[in-house]
Structure formats: structure tokens, C-alpha cells
């Protein structure tokens, strides 16, 4: 298990790789020469699959007359599905439908090597690739000889993205007054809580001064350009609130002040506590190391206890934490790798004589000690509710760009999702309900002729005048199968006869809404639509 994820993470930073299967000793077999090269792909993204198809089509048009054409074989289940499929085909010696190349992580080469089916990319020109992008081949165990068995073709890395307005509020709340020797300054805020001025200092080194200047600038821009509008709904009425952007008449430092006021509404007031930002010196280099980043995040969480550290349950509209992670394996393994001075000899395993050596994982080994240090750092952060771990299906930035995180680490492939543009809007219910991110997100479709006709009599019989804003479709959750229901009942009743199985064989609850279209209106809801059922009235504020 350690080998699987250890290899996966570092190849993940390099990108996906091509692995070739060949004919050939232990468990070898010859594949049928069908006059084409089969490329297996388990990409789940439609856009990525479409891009790959375009590349293959282009190659097939320009290839040499005697060169084999490439044919894509689609495998379900993502990269794990591709791994399982390859292992199965190798074990049964599939000579006819087995593919020749696969897009996956390079530890699959070890699976091929156990059967003598690995094939080096001898003769392939890799001059345009940095040697550093090929070094992972040196850490593949079980191969017959050192060579390039996998080549990166799609590159991404994990990046740290800061929310400048949130950071400005955090740091500005915690720092000393400029030129003031007083330790604390108290004032009454709107919610009658005591606002405490902190004792934190901001470093004077060049990097820190530049970062603080950038943070101040971005906070000022946020205060000038952004405001959150809220709309009070009538009792028992389900309306939506739009978070919109509107111009503010603020200038100079007032922009940052306006930004802080808005951020405070979400993050609450600063607390001067031991182990927090009290007497702390903030420097830009906290973002250079995992230990520094996690330690700073823990201090921030403790300093905003009313909204972060003391909160046991969170809604989708609440502060989710200080640091957000899209991939916990990536974060864990890279932080352990960094703790070992970025030396593979200090990592979970090392390749020795062509085999994976796990001696580092002994209790007194370097990897064990490094993991223990990293674990203790993360434990302090999780104990203070400062860590947000993405459940999957979306990007952490879904929270961060609405100021619910101070910063996050995610794939560079999702960089574009980290920013809220001028037209970015989020729907928020005012009756204490909400759309939980990231498990439930919907695309809103712009109104067209068909949607306007379906949008009600008011739209079809008169000019629309922009009343219909758009539509989205509700999809019912997948219902349990009879087998799954039976397993659940058996577990709950521990061998006793179930009192009843009313849902077995019946239509799944919620399926009446499957494919149901919800219409969003700006000024009024047509007579043939029902508010909160198939229509929602939205107003900007």
C-alpha cells in the first residue's frame, strides 16, 4: 500500500505517463499483431478525453504510410480502474484484446515487470524533457534494467493559493498598532463583543514587506469592488440570495477597511490567546515550508475560536477552516518527503538492487520519525478545526473564493476555479438551508428559445424582458439496490427478521424529481409555476 501511493504522488507531480506492454520471460506472452497500436485511457474528464481523441486523430492523419495507426481503448473507473484492468489482462494472458500502451501512473511498470512484460522506450527522443522529469524511472522496482519505461505526457503540480482579503483581515487584526507600544486596544463591535488589538509583528525582511504590500493592495481592491447583498425572505418561503459585486465609493486605505468589515462578518473577531498569533512574528517564509505553513494555520485557527476552533459542526456557508487540501495523500507524502530533506533515501521506501526496500519504515527509521513529526503538526491543526479536507467531486476553491478559507493547496489543473470573476455568483438559501459544497453543485443554463417557451405562459405570450435568468436540473441520488438494502437490514438487525422492507422493489424516493427543471426568475414567477417547487425568484442586492 505504501508503495502504491508513494509512487503515485511523485509521478503525479510529473504528470501521467505512458507504459508499454511487450511480448516476452516469467508469464510472458505474445500479443496478436492486429496492425494497430491500442492506447488504453481511463480519463474521466470529458474535455481531457476529447483532447486526447483530437491528438490521436491528428497523428493518424500525418503518420507515415508504414506506421501503425493508434486506436483508443476506453477503460472505466479512472486510474484505479485502469490498474485493475491491466492486472487482469496480464494474469489471464489476454493475447487478442490487450492494449499496447496505457495512460496511468508509472508504478504499473512494476506490475508488468513481474511478468516480464515491461518495454523500455529505447530510441524515443526525450531531449525536450528535463532529466528531472524522467528520474522517477530510477525508482521503479522489479525492472530488468535501468531505462525509461514511462514518459510524462501531461503535467500538473500542487500549488498554494492565498486569499488576500482574508489574510489581510487576519494579519491586520492580530498585529500591533503601527508606532503604538500599547499591548491591547479594546473597542466595542456591533455584536457587543470586545475587539482586542493584537501583539503580532510583521517581519521587516524584503520578502515579507513585498507580500504584505500585495495583500494590502488586494484587500483594498476587494473593499472597493465587492459587497455582499442579502435578501430577507418571508417566513416559510424559499428564496435565494445572490452574492454580487457592486461599486463602492471608497478610496485609499478605506478600501481595505471596508474589506475587513465584510470579512469580519464571516470570520468573527480576533482573540489574543497563547498558542495563537499572540507575540508571533509573521514572515513570508511561513509559506515556504510545510511545518511553517501548518504551524501558522494552527495559530490562526486558535485566534478565531468563535468561528473556527470552537465550532464542532459546520454548514456549507460557514468558515470551513484555515487551510484547505484537495488531495490529502499529496499533502501527507510531500510533507514527509520535505521533512526528509527531499531525499528518497529518507522516504517511505527506496529502490535497492532493483527491489523496493521498506526498511525506512521501521520504528527507528528515518521515514518513521519524519512521519511522526508531520503527523503531530497535522494533529494540532485538526484539533483546532483549522484543516479542511475536500470530499472530492469539486475544488477546495469553491469555498476559498467566497472567503471561507484563508488559503488552499490544490492541483494547478484547477487554477482557473480559484477566482471569483465579475460575473461569479453563488446561490444561498435564506431559510437556514443551503447547497452543501462540494457534494452538490449545479450548472445553470442560460435561457434559450426552448427554455423561454417552457418557462411559463407569461414568457411565451409576451416579451420576456430578461425575466427568465436560467434553469438547472435536479438529479435524484442513486438508490440502493435490493442487495444493498438487504445487507443494511442484516447488519442493523444482526440476524433478526426485518420488520419490513417497504422500499424494496419500489421506485426510489426522489426519483419523481429526476430530470426536473427548476426555473430562475428575476422579477416575477409566471402563473403556471410554483415558488419553491419548480421556480425560484432571485433578486440582486
UniProtKB/Swiss-Prot annotation:
GO CC terms in record: plasma membrane
Residue runs in coiled coils = none
Please state the span of the N-terminal signal peptide per the UniProt entry: 1-22
> Could you tell me the membrane topology recorded for this protein?
Lipid-anchor
Q: Where in the cell is it found?
A: Cell membrane
Q: Where are the transmembrane segments?
A: none
Q: Which UniProt keywords apply?
A: Cell membrane, Lipoprotein, Membrane, Palmitate, Signal
Compositionally biased residues, Basic and acidic residues: 480-490
Could you tell me where the Low complexity compositional bias lies? Answer: 448-460
Give the similarity note. Answer: Belongs to the MG185/MG260 family.
Q: What is the name of this protein?
A: Uncharacterized lipoprotein MPN_097
User: What is the organism field in this record?
Assistant: Mycoplasma pneumoniae (strain ATCC 29342 / M129 / Subtype 1)
Amino acid at each position: 500500500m505504501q508503495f502504491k501511493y508513494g509512487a503515485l504522488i511523485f509521478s503525479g507531480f510529473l504528470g501521467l505517463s505512458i507504459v508499454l506492454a511487450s511480448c516476452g520471460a516469467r508469464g510472458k506472452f505474445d500479443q496478436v499483431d492486429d496492425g494497430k497500436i491500442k492506447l488504453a485511457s481511463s480519463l474521466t474528464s470529458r474535455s481531457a478525453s476529447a483532447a486526447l481523441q483530437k491528438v490521436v486523430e491528428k497523428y493518424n492523419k500525418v503518420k507515415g504510410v508504414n506506421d501503425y495507426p493508434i486506436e483508443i481503448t476506453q477503460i472505466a473507473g479512472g486510474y484505479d480502474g485502469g490498474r485493475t484492468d491491466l492486472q487482469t489482462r496480464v494474469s489471464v494472458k489476454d493475447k487478442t484484446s490487450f492494449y499496447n500502451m496505457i495512460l496511468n501512473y508509472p508504478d504499473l511498470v512494476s506490475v508488468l515487470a513481474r511478468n516480464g512484460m515491461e518495454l523500455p522506450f529505447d530510441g524515443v527522443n526525450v531531449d525536450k524533457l528535463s532529466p528531472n522529469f524522467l528520474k522517477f524511472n530510477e525508482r521503479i522496482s522489479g525492472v530488468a534494467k535501468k531505462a525509461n519505461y514511462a514518459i510524462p505526457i501531461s503535467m500538473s503540480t500542487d500549488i498554494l493559493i492565498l486569499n488576500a482579503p482574508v489574510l489581510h483581515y487576519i494579519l491586520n487584526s492580530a498585529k500591533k498598532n503601527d508606532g503604538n507600544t500599547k499591548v491591547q486596544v479594546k473597542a466595542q463591535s456591533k455584536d457587543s463583543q470586545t475587539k482586542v488589538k493584537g501583539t503580532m509583528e510583521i517581519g521587516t525582511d524584503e520578502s515579507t514587506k513585498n507580500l504584505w504590500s500585495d495583500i494590502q493592495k488586494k484587500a483594498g481592491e476587494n473593499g472597493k469592488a465587492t459587497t455582499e447583498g442579502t435578501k430577507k425572505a418571508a417566513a416559510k418561503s424559499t428564496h435565494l440570495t445572490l452574492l454580487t459585486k457592486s461599486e463602492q465609493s471608497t478610496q485609499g486605505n478605506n478600501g481595505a477597511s471596508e474589506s475587513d468589515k465584510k470579512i469580519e462578518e464571516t470570520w468573527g473577531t480576533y482573540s489574543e490567546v497563547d498558542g495563537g498569533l499572540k507575540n508571533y512574528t509573521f514572515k513570508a517564509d511561513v509559506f515556504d515550508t510545510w511545518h511553517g505553513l501548518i504551524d501558522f494555520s494552527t495559530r490562526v485557527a486558535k485566534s478565531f475560536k468563535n468561528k473556527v476552533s470552537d465550532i464542532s459542526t459546520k454548514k456549507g456557508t460557514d468558515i470551513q477552516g484555515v487551510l484547505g487540501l484537495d488531495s490529502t495523500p499529496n499533502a501527507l507524502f510531500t510533507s514527509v518527503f520535505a521533512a526528509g530533506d527531499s531525499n528518497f533515501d529518507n522516504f517511505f521506501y527506496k529502490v535497492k538492487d532493483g527491489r523496493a526496500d521498506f526498511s525506512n519504515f521501521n520504528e527507528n527509521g528515518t521515514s518513521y520519525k519524519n512521519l511522526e513529526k508531520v503527523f503531530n503538526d497535522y494533529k494540532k491543526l485538526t484539533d483546532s478545526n483549522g484543516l479542511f479536507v475536500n470530499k472530492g467531486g469539486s475544488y477546495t476553491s469553491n469555498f476559498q473564493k467566497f472567503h471561507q478559507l484563508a488559503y488552499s493547496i490544490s492541483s494547478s489543473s484547477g487554477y482557473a476555479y480559484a477566482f471569483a470573476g465579475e460575473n461569479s455568483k453563488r446561490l444561498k438559501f435564506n431559510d437556514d438551508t443551503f447547497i452543501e459544497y462540494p457534494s452538490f453543485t449545479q450548472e445553470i443554463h442560460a435561457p434559450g428559445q426552448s427554455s423561454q417557451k417552457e418557462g411559463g405562459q407569461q414568457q411565451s405570450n409576451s416579451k420576456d424582458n430578461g425575466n427568465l435568468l436560467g434553469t438547472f436540473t435536479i438529479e435524484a441520488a442513486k438508490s440502493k439496490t435490493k442487495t444493498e438494502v438487504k445487507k443494511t437490514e442484516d447488519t442493523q438487525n444482526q440476524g433478526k427478521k426485518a420488520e419490513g422492507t417497504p422500499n424494496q422493489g419500489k421506485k426510489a424516493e426522489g426519483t419523481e424529481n429526476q430530470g426536473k427543471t427548476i426555473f430562475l426568475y428575476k422579477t416575477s414567477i409566471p402563473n403556471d409555476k410554483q415558488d419553491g417547487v419548480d421556480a425560484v425568484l432571485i433578486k440582486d442586492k
